[in-house]
Amino acid sequence: MPPSAQDLPLGHSTGSETPIRSSVELGAVIRDQRKRLALKQLDLAGLGNTGNRFIVDLENGKPTVQLQKVLDLMDLLGLEVVVRTKASRSASAP
């Protein structure tokens, strides 16, 4: 039987951070987390009330996926987006 949303690790943060600079990198992080949770793409699609095609596109880094759907799926997987100012590359940069 596929897992339910109650089975997922909502709010259980390991404290790890991964800088994301592209849709491909974000897709890889989401794929890795889905696999860590032993979910199939179809399971995640069902839990997220979306189609399997969306999951495939997201995990493959399609840059035009719907942002709110991505955020909702990340929440289901126990992931979150944190925006912060980038550290300067060097003190002498203009």
Language-model segment annotations:
Residues 26, 37:
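Flexible coil/turn residues that form the inter-helical turn or adjacent wing/linker of helix-turn-helix
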